[in-house]
Regions:
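Oxidoreductase cofactor-interface core, primarily capturing Rossmann-like NAD(P)-dependent enzymes
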Residues: 25-30, 45, 119-216
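Short, glycine/serine-rich, charged loops/turns that create anion-binding
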Residues: 13, 39, 77, 116
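Short, polar loop motifs at secondary-structure junctions
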Residues: 33-41
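N-terminal Rossmann NAD(P)H-binding glycine-rich loop of SDR-like oxidoreductase domains
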Residues: 3-28
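Conserved Rossmann-fold NAD(P)-dependent oxidoreductase catalytic core, especially the SDR/UDP-sugar
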Residues: 83, 88-134, 138-147
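SDR active-site strand-loop-helix element
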Residues: 9, 35, 72-73, 109-115, ...
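NAD(P)H-binding glycine-rich loop region in Rossmannoid oxidoreductase-like domains
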Residues: 6, 41, 47-96, 100-103, ...
Length: 216
C-alpha cells in the first residue's frame, strides 16, 4: 500500500505539535510537509518544514501532491493584536492553505476548531471559527473532520507561550466542579484532540464533527 503524504499547518501550536508527532510516528505516512511562520522543533527524515509568511503567500503554489491536510493554525485576539489580525490568521490563512491543498490533490481535511464555533454567533471569536467551518464545508472535500475542543490542557511553557490566567482558573474550577460540567465543556488534553482527529481523518467520508466530550 502506498504511503500517505500529509500537509499540516500550525505544527508548532499546542494541538498541532501533537498532530505532527502522531504523523511522524505513523508508519503509513511517508511524507509530512509542515507550513508555519517558524519551523517545528521536531526533526525527522520524513518531515519537510516550509517557513511561510501567510500574509504574502496566500496561494502556496508549490505544495506537493498530498492525501490529507490538517489545519491547526490559530491564535487569540490578544496575541494577534486586533480582530482583523486574528481573522487574518484563523480564517484567511487556514482557508488559503485548504484551497492550495485541494489544488494539490488533497481529498481529506482535518480542522482544529473550537467549542462554540457558530457563524451566526454574536461573539467574534466563535463567529470566525464558525465561518471557517462553513467555508471548508462548501469546498466539498471527500472527507472533512472538524474537531471542537473545549479548554485545552497542555504545556504552554514548552511552546514558549505564557500561561493564560483564564485557563488556570478554568482548570481549577473544573477540578472542583467536574461533576456539574457537561463532558463537552470539560478541559481536554491537546494530545487527546490530536489522537481523535488523526484517527478520524484517514477514514472520513463527508462531514464529521468531533465534539470535545467524544475526544476524551
Amino acid at each position: 500500500m502506498a504511503k500517505r503524504t500529509v500537509i499540516i499547518v500550525g505544527a508548532t501550536g499546542m494541538v498541532g505539535r501533537e498532530i505532527l508527532a502522531g504523523l511522524l510516528a505513523d508508519d503509513s505516512v511517508g511524507e509530512v510537509h509542515s507550513l508555519g511562520r517558524r519551523p517545528p522543533t521536531m526533526q525527522h527524515p520524513k518531515l519537510t518544514a516550509h517557513v511561510v509568511n501567510f500574509a504574502s503567500q496566500p496561494l502556496f503554489p508549490n505544495l506537493p501532491q498530498a492525501d490529507e491536510v490538517y489545519l491547526a493554525l490559530g491564535t487569540t485576539i490578544k496575541v494577534a493584536g486586533s480582530q482583523q489580525a486574528f481573522r487574518a490568521i484563523d480564517y484567511d490563512a487556514n482557508l488559503a492553505v485548504a484551497r492550495a491543498a485541494q489544488a494539490a490533490g488533497v481529498t481529506k481535511l482535518g480542522l482544529v476548531s473550537a467549542m462554540g464555533a457558530d457563524a451566526s454567533s454574536s461573539v467574534f471569536y466563535n463567529r470566525v471559527k464558525g465561518e471557517l467551518e462553513e467555508a471548508l464545508e462548501k469546498m466539498s472535500f471527500a472527507g472533512l473532520v472538524i474537531a471542537r475542543p473545549s479548554l485545552l490542557v497542555g504545556d504552554r511553557e514548552a511552546l514558549g507561550q505564557p500561561a493564560r490566567r483564564g485557563e488556570k482558573l478554568g482548570l481549577a474550577l473544573s477540578k472542583v466542579l467536574s461533576f456539574l460540567i457537561p463532558a463537552n465543556y470539560q478541559p481536554i488534553a491537546a494530545a487527546a484532540v490530536a489522537k481523535a482527529i488523526l484517527t478520524a481523518v484517514p477514514q472520513a467520508q463527508g462531514k464529521n464533527i468531533l465534539l470535545s466530550g467524544a475526544m476524551h
